Amino acid sequence: MIDRLKKSISKTKRAERSRFKLKKLGSRPRLVFIKSNQYLSCQIIDDIQGVTLAYATTSEKTFTGEGKSKKDKGAAKVLGKLIAERGSQKGVKQVMLDRSGMIFHGRIAAFAEGAREAGLEF
C-alpha cells in the first residue's frame, strides 16, 4: 500500500514540476495528453487566456482507430493526427507537449509522432 501511495505521489510531483516549467515558458499553448482506463484524450490549452482551443478523445462516435482497442498505440497515433487537424483549424501550429508526469514512451510517443506528421511543432 505504501509503495502505491509513494508511486502516486511521485507521479503527481513529476506532473506539477513539468507543468510549472511549461507555464513558465508560457508563450505557446499546451498540448495535454490524458490516459484513462478505457480511452485516450488530449486538448490544446491556452494558459494565458485560460481557454481550451481544441479537444479530441477516442470515446467520440466519429473516432475510427487503426485497431480494435481505443487505448493502444494505433489509436494514440490517430488521435495525434486528429488533434493536429483541429488545432490547425484554430490557427495553432506550435505547442508544448504536457505529458502529465508520464515518460515519453509507448502511447505518448505514438501520439506525438501522429501529431508531428499532421503538422504540429513541439
Curated annotation (Swiss-Prot):
Transmembrane segments annotated in the record for this chain: none
Domain of life the protein comes from: Bacteria
GO cellular component: cytosolic large ribosomal subunit
Biological process according to GO: translation
Assigned keywords, A-Z: Ribonucleoprotein, Ribosomal protein, RNA-binding, rRNA-binding
Keyword RNA-binding belongs to the record: yes
Pfam families found in the cross-reference section: Ribosomal_L18p
GO terms for MF: 5S rRNA binding; structural constituent of ribosome
InterPro entries (UniProt xref): Ribosomal_uL18_bac-type, Ribosomal_uL18_bac/euk
Family per record: Belongs to the universal ribosomal protein uL18 family.
HAMAP family named in the record: Ribosomal_uL18_B
General function of this protein: This is one of the proteins that bind and probably mediate the attachment of the 5S RNA into the large ribosomal subunit, where it forms part of the central protuberance.
Subunit structure: Part of the 50S ribosomal subunit; part of the 5S rRNA/L5/L18/L25 subcomplex. Contacts the 5S and 23S rRNAs.
Name of the featured protein: Large ribosomal subunit protein uL18
Organism: Leptospira interrogans serogroup Icterohaemorrhagiae serovar Lai (strain 56601)
Organism taxonomic ancestry: Bacteria, Pseudomonadati, Spirochaetota, Spirochaetia, Leptospirales
